[in-house]
Amino acid sequence: IGWQGKWANTLRLWEAQPTTMFDLERFNRGDYAAAAEPEALARTLSRVLYPDDTTYQGKELRLKQEFFLTSAALQDILRRFKNRHSDLRALPKYAAIQMNDTHPAIAGPELIRLLMDENGMGFGDALEVAQQCLGYTNHTLLPEALERWATFTFGNVLPRHMQIVERIDAWH
């Protein structure tokens, strides 16, 4: 319970679940490992947070995890907002989204993507809403704590977000 015993914050715990549990056709062909692969890969997103990223696969999984957790939180914020309000351009009056590390930095492009692609907002309005809603604080300047993604990896894992980042760069 928070300030003056009147407020409680909600803690959301996200779990990745597969869209297909088991490929019976592959199983019946004798490819047992491949039959279970879609489920195993999906659950890997939320099974162990922040894997060793010294390999390309580790870097890719980490980026997927950061996207998954950030997107889930943003989608929940938008869902709750739309239950009470009709104009998403008013979101900054009701939501302040604070990022306290580099891990959720994908929130900018993801919020813009959700507003544009899922809710039909134009780029200029979506960018303005994101700028007004999102805040960022980092508590260290150590290079190893400041995450960066190779353009190839980022574009391969999140091609739509790469387009949005390039559009933001061109806008400014």
What are these regions (language model features)?
Residues 1-172:
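A conserved ligand/cofactor-binding region detector
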